[in-house]
Amino acid sequence: GLILCSLPLQGQSRQNISLKFMGLSFHPLSGRPNAKLMPNRLDPEAYFVVDLGALLSYEYFIIPEILSVKGIQGLYADCTAQLAGVTSIGLRARIFRIGRHRLYGGIGPTWIYRRNWYRLPGYVDTKYFEGSPTDKWQRKFLWYGGELEYKYALSPKLDIATTFVPGYPDLMAFAVGLSYNL
C-alpha cells in the first residue's frame, strides 16, 4: 500500500522548475534604523521597499503533488539596491488543492547574503547579519527558512505561481512567476 502511494500517477509530473520575479518587500517593524539608506523605499520609514530580482527553483516530488524537496537560488537588489542572494533547500507539502488552485508550505535551511552594508555611510548594525566591517559580504543562516506558494494551473504543464516568504519580524517578501512541470 505505502509503496503504491509513492509511485507517480499517470499524468502527474514528479518535477518542476520555476522562475519568479521579486519586486516588493515589507518590513513589519519598519526599516529603521537604516531606512534612509534604502533608495527604493515607498514610504519614509521603509515599511515597503522595491527590491527587484529573480528566483529560480527546482522541485522534485517524493509523493506526487503532496510532498517534495525544493531548491531555490535567488539574486536580487536588496533594500539598499546592492547585490544580494538567497539559497535554500527544504521540504514542502501541499496544504490544499481545490480544482486548479493549490497552496504549498515549505521549510528548510536558508542562506541569505548581501554586499556589506558597513560600506554605506550611516549604516547602523542591527546584529541580524553576520560579518565584520572589512568583509565583502554579510550573511545569515536560518535552519527554518520558510515559504508559502500559491499555484494556479493554466494547463497540465504550466502554472502561475506566487511566493510569500514570512520572515517576521524582519522582512516579508513576495514573488510572482511561472512554474513548468517537466
Residue ranges and their predicted role:
Residues 1-18, 182:
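Bacterial Sec-dependent N-terminal signal peptides
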Residues 14-16, 49, 53:
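N-terminal amphipathic/basic helix or basic patch
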Residues 55-57:
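Short, intrinsically disordered low-complexity segments
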